A protein has these predicted regions:
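Conserved, structured core segments of small domains
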Residues: 1-97
Length: 97
């Protein structure tokens, strides 16, 4: 498995984002529960988000992003996926608390 970071930028439609948020979070939770997401969350300023997929390859990461309700509803203005090579990892980073 490899890590892929999705750096997403939200479109300016906050109402759309708030309406879509519950299904987006349900989708992410379903991936997290089966080990496909290492971590995720919005930027503190609510302009975008980061998702870290733990998947086999770029094709799988692209597929998962394409299925995300934020992507299909147009909440994301832009999204970039980069394979991420972790050099240092804190011992608590596997804690889901």
């Amino acid at each position: 498995m490899a890590l892929f970071a999705v750096i997403g930028e939200f479109a300016d439609d906050q109402d759309l984002r708030l309406r879509t948020r519950p299904t987006h979070r349900e989708y992410l939770r379903s991936l997290f529960d089966v080990g496909k997401i290492a971590m995720s969350g919005p930027w503190e300023d609510e302009t975008g988000m980061l998702i870290v997929y733990d998947v086999a390859d770029m094709a799988e990461a692209e597929h998962l992003l394409a299925q995300d309700p934020y992507r299909s509803a147009g909440v994301l203005a832009n999204a970039t996926i980069k394979e991420w090579r972790v050099v240092l990892r804190a011992p608590w980073s596997n804690d889901n608390q």
